[in-house]
A protein has these predicted regions:
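Ferredoxin-type iron-sulfur electron-transfer modules and their immediate structural context
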Residues: 1-150, 154, 177-179, 183-189
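Hydrophobic residues embedded in beta-strands of well-ordered beta-sheets
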Residues: 89, 162-163
Length: 189
């Protein structure tokens, strides 16, 4: 809350060196809205992601990596920074204080804290390969590597069949997002 000046004073009092403190923000690694993600069944249990994740198949969405959309993250956010829109959690970047409660609560680990200054991020967490992704979600990363080949700065790599953007290398040119056939790479500003 107090930023770098307060961190510096606290470090001075404690006799340690202050690290850098870049503002963070929650980011939902799923674009699998009701319009684009297939369902395996209709879930009628308790409206809680943690409970739904205990059901065989980890919720009603056919993608076992995606946002369950039942709002457990919304419930724990004391700042009103999260909402469920069309079956997927959405973050209000201006309200998020990066407390990490949503990250800790999400049973599918779909929410991460990323630097507020990140230019682009990949809105998918599936580790499945292309064809398997397309069978369950029209907006999932298919691991085609076009984004990797477009990046002149080496900021985009493929890890576990999914594009990963290194914010320390990303120059914000947007070529990766332009080339992505699934439009799963999004500008954050």
């Amino acid at each position: 809350v107090g930023g770098a000046p307060v961190a510096g004073k606290i470090a001075e009092i404690l006799g340690v060196e202050a690290g850098s403190s870049e503002k963070q923000v929650a980011f939902v690694k799923c674009a699998g809205t009701c319009d684009v993600a297939a369902n395996k069944y209709h879930y009628v249990g308790e409206m809680d992601c943690r409970r739904a994740a205990m059901v065989p198949g980890r919720g009603e969405k056919a993608c076992s990596y995606g946002c369950l959309g039942l709002g457990s993250c919304v419930e724990v956010c004391q700042f009103g920074a999260l909402s469920i829109q069309n079956g997927v959690a959405k973050v209000d970047r201006d309200k998020c204080v990066a407390c990490g409660q949503c990250v800790a609560t999400c049973p599918n680990h779909v929410i991460d804290l990323i630097p507020y200054s990140s230019a682009y991020a990949v809105q998918c967490s599936s580790k499945d390969k292309g064809k398997a992704v397309m069978e369950v979600c029209q907006s999932g990363c298919i691991g085609c590597g076009l984004c990797v080949r477009q990046c002149e700065f080496g900021a985009v790599t493929l890890e576990d069949n999914i594009a990963v953007i290194d914010g320390t290398k990303c120059q914000g040119c947007g070529k990766c997002a332009e080339k992505c056939p699934k439009k799963v790479i999004h500008a954050q500003q």
